[in-house]
UniProtKB/Swiss-Prot annotation:
Record's protein name: 23S rRNA (uracil(747)-C(5))-methyltransferase RlmC
Source organism per UniProt: Shigella boydii serotype 18 (strain CDC 3083-94 / BS512)
Enzyme Commission number(s): 2.1.1.189
Function comment: Catalyzes the formation of 5-methyl-uridine at position 747 (m5U747) in 23S rRNA.
Gene name in the database record: rlmC
Pfam families referenced in this protein's UniProt entry, alphabetically: tRNA_U5-meth_tr
GO biological process: rRNA base methylation
Length: 375
């Protein structure tokens, strides 16, 4: 992938950009095999990759510069701002949005937040696009509600310029720290969730719910899990750390009893909305801590699917799964190091199948799917 920002030494986020995709996949596969070297693996499936550019459905832009000439991008470690509107990871559809946002910021008087001086209001612009209909969600992350009235007043112009903006919100993040969002979300549109669709499964994206940033690869990940589950003799499963329900909704059949657990209420609201659309009445989604939910149960389902954050599922949940011994565990991980550490804590299981998904091209990161079977 060619990138003018990288070539000019202005951005180094894509550290592997000079390597061809097959070389990147080989290096990632070697890393994964090294991490799982102590475990016999019955089947290594071919790695899955997607487009090498224009694949991201989300932009997280630090707003810097001046109110008259805002920059959207990032801050270097020394505080120097860098505009990333031309980043080739973003689809072409993002360019007109960035172009309209700059004069809008000036018109609405949204002074960019200055980290060094601890002054200003607009901290971040967060943009998400649906692959199914091109609709977009735009979030303004502000330090306070001081400029909210001005933003509301100027908003009709932006909506006229960009009719693809279906959901617009203001998030209030008052803390002087590099935290992307605060707890308060103020909706400026009637619509509160962005409709998405993977493999004919309706999904919803809300402001404070996690959603994969590489839809081309994520849709293949979900489809693969569905295929793996359909091959297993199970009618009951848990989907832990379920997010907006992507895995569970793909796996569910009318006679499958499924419980999805996720700590974020916004994500659970999305999952419930999708289940209702599909008419699946045996799916139950709850906003709870996954580890606390599981370890409080006196019995375990035949299949437990886990998709934890980078820290992994942790020893308490590993100990519970070791003791209760479900027939199958499907582990989806964005950090193979912690996954390998967790598998070490599950001695009663063997690794039936492993597949790498290149969710983050041009970096060392990847997603991995592992099927564990009770010995």
């Amino acid at each position: 992938m060619q990138c003018a920002l990288y070539d000019a030494g202005r951005c180094r986020s894509c550290q592997w950009i000079t390597q061809l995709i097959p070389e990147q996949l080989s290096a990632k596969t070697a890393d994964l095999k090294n991490l799982l070297a102590d475990f016999p693996v019955e089947e290594w499936c071919a790695p899955v990759s997607g487009p090498e550019q224009g694949f991201r459905n989300k932009a997280k832009m630090v707003v810097s510069g001046s109110v008259e000439k805002p920059l959207l991008g990032m801050l270097h470690r020394d505080g120097t701002p860098e505009d990333l509107c031309d980043c080739p990871l973003y689809p072409a559809s993002f360019a007109p949005v960035f172009a309209a946002l700059k004069p809008f910021i000036a018109c609405a008087g949204l002074t960019p937040y200055n980290v060094a001086r601890k002054r200003g209001e607009l901290k971040y612009i967060l943009l998400t696009e649906s692959q199914s209909d091109g609709g977009m969600m735009l979030r303004f992350v502000l330090r306070s509600e001081t400029k909210l009235a001005q933003l509301r007043k100027a908003l009709p112009w932006l909506q006229e310029q960009l009719p693809q903006l279906k959901v617009i919100t203001v998030n209030i993040q008052p803390v002087h720290m590099a935290i992307m969002e605060g707890e308060t979300e103020i909706y400026l549109t009637e619509q509160q969730a962005l409709a998405e669709r993977f493999n004919d499964v309706p999904l919803w994206i809300r402001p404070q719910s996690f959603f994969q940033t590489n839809p081309a690869v994520a849709s293949q990940l979900y489809a693969t899990v569905r295929d793996w589950v359909r091959q297993l003799p199970v009618k009951h499963m848990w989907d832990l750390f379920c997010g907006v329900g992507g895995f569970g909704l793909h796996c569910a059949t009318p006679d499958m009893q499924l419980t999805g657990i996720e700590i974020a209420p916004e994500a659970i609201a999305c999952a419930k909305q999708s289940a209702a659309e599909l008419g699946l009445t045996r799916l139950q989604f709850q906003a709870l801590d996954s580890t606390q939910f599981a370890t409080a149960q006196g019995e375990v389902q035949e299949l437990v699917l886990v998709n934890p954050p980078r820290r992994g599922i942790g020893k308490p949940l590993c100990d519970y799964l070791s003791t209760m011994a479900p027939r199958f565990i499907i582990y989806s991980s964005c950090n193979a190091q912690t996954m390998a550490k967790d598998i070490r804590e599950l001695p009663g299981f063997r690794i039936e199948r492993v597949q790498l998904f290149d969710m983050f091209p041009h970096t060392a990161h990847y997603e991995v799917l592992t099927l564990l079977v009770k010995q």
